[in-house]
């Protein structure tokens, strides 16, 4: 059952006690039904990634947020430390997950807006992500290569995106690298 709108939503920092609910959000949000070409898939990759980022100490806790709907964790956004030219000078957004039954009612957008505000308040110069080129530009994201930040793999520039924040300064450029948990996904 999909809801048409949400009556009451609270965005807050994630707490240690939210870990199981956050995992459940990502498992559900990234699950794919079986098709003729592929078997069903749980969102274990994204859920494990969030768990690994947390275990490695690479999450930026002030920016990792949950959305509660009627007291239940229904969405989550992870923000982790990222590197440019091997310096930990940026943060990366993702995964961003929302329970399927409350998708398309503004929870993901609210989480993105709130986490961008939190990153800006912390003095982060920019937020980088690998994401859908028609969803993220509404939040001010554009190709990272336009700002001198190059992706770690051969992703199209329309998918590797950056949003400058108030602390952005000239001279920040070079090859981008995610936290180690992202790099282990390729293993």
Q: What is each stretch, according to the model?
A:
Residues 10-24:
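A short beta-loop-alpha structural element at the N-terminal edge
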Residues 121-125, 130-156:
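Conserved active-site alpha-helix within GNAT-family acetyltransferase domains
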Residues 27-78:
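Active-site rim helix/loop that mediates acceptor-substrate recognition in acyltransferases
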Residues 93, 98, 104-117, 128-129:
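Conserved acetyl-CoA-binding loop-helix of GNAT-fold acetyltransferases
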Residues 82-93, 103:
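A conserved beta-turn-beta hairpin within the catalytic core of GNAT-like acetyltransferases
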